[in-house]
Amino acid sequence: MTEEHRLISAESVTEGHPDKVCDQISDAILDDLLVQDPSSHVAVETSAATGVFLVFGEVTSKGYCDVQSKVRETLRNIGYTSSEVGLDADSCGVVVAITEQSAEINQGVARLTGDQETAASREERYEAQGAGDQGVMFGYATDETPTLMPLPIYLAHRLAFRLTEVRKSGEVPHLRPDGKTQVTIEYDDNDKPVRLDTVLISTQHDPEVTQDWLAVELKKHVIDPVLDEVLGSKVPHDNYRQLVNPTGSFILGGPAADAGLTGRKIIVDTYGGAAHHGGGAFSGKDPSKVDRSAAYATRWVAKNIVAAGLAHKVEIQIAYAIGVADPVSVNVETFGTEQGVTRGQIAAAVRKVFDLRPAAIIDELDLKRPIYLKTAAYGHFGRTDVEFPWEKTDKVEELKAAIAAE
């Protein structure tokens, strides 16, 4: 590797990782409430320890969620079905401490209710719904992969997803739910990926498994298929370092080995460290929370900019004040990669094309639907196994037209 080249890494985790277990429980509860009442206001956190879960937070909804049943259902779907793997969904403890949303917070988010909302025009609704909290959110896109995601996090997610696939299908026997992946990519001085450097997989397994056997099976059934699919002939990967369970055995995993908490994998959820993060987590939050909806919206904006060929990569920063509909700031950063336009022209086009008030985002991306459990593992962005509305590139022509009209 030359002095001008650099190594960039990103990690992912499987759905059986303790923090991801908590994310999925929180989003499963959110989805259940949105099915019954799309206007539910939800902020639900989950924490996990050995054999016990605490579900807590605030909910205002016309719906009802049987939290105990939802926790157990989620755990069973992940694969925690016996004490042998470290957790039995049917016998673990579940403690629930959920209260109503603060009236002071609600008054800035839901100024129109009932008949008022029904009678209001779209513009009145958009102005009436302020942000659910203050905060700064970021969205990012880059043309280094077809999904417009950074290659390290995209590849790490694909490996984690495939690891779970072969576990659940039995293609690789003796695997257990907990697992992590990490990828290191070499970039040249033009910020182009030029070589795969390292693939790391740590996976929980049955006691009878040897590490040598596991390394062979994972290379055959997980690593090689994913590398061929994602990298193909575009990025050399014939001489990389493979690490599988580098500390040795990994029998005890999940919440039995490490405590879990909702919102503790925010870099895994987003861009793997390639972009800034405002700090707000996603899971368990309904779309009135701009931590979630605005992060989705900024990804949507960024992806359309790159898809339109206006820049090779772009980061969007947006900020809100609680109870105020319009963003207090929107910033566009293209890192000097803009193509035939200025950064200022792109920023002006964004302001013209995208309405980034919370209610407008919710309407445009249709966010009051039960789509969130699927986001809670393997990344919220750049997915190929499921379609999310913030991944659509439906504003490409409008952006081009806005710039042409300047």
From Swiss-Prot:
Keywords: ATP-binding, Cytoplasm, Magnesium, Metal-binding, Nucleotide-binding, One-carbon metabolism, Potassium, Transferase. Binds 2 divalent ions per subunit. Binds 1 potassium ion per subunit. The keyword Manganese does not apply. Catalyzes the formation of S-adenosylmethionine (AdoMet) from methionine and ATP. The overall synthetic reaction is composed of two sequential steps, AdoMet formation and the subsequent tripolyphosphate hydrolysis which occurs prior to release of AdoMet from the enzyme. GO terms for molecular function: ATP binding; magnesium ion binding; methionine adenosyltransferase activity. NCBIfam families: metK. Homotetramer; dimer of dimers. Its cofactor is Mg(2+); K(+). Pathway: Amino-acid biosynthesis; S-adenosyl-L-methionine biosynthesis; S-adenosyl-L-methionine from L-methionine: step 1/1. GO terms for cellular component: cytoplasm. Belongs to the AdoMet synthase family. K(+) binds at residue 45. One of its GO terms (biological process) is S-adenosylmethionine biosynthetic process. This is S-adenosylmethionine synthase. It catalyses: L-methionine + ATP + H2O = S-adenosyl-L-methionine + phosphate + diphosphate. InterPro entries: ADOMET_SYNTHASE_CS, S-AdoMet_synt_C, S-AdoMet_synt_central, S-AdoMet_synt_N, S-AdoMet_synthetase, S-AdoMet_synthetase_sfam. Mg(2+) binds at residue 19. The lineage of its organism: Bacteria, Bacillati, Actinomycetota, Actinomycetes, Bifidobacteriales. CDD domains: S-AdoMet_synt. L-methionine binds at residues 58, 101, 258, 289. ATP binds at residues 17, 178-180, 258, 264-265, 281, 285. It is found in: Cytoplasm.
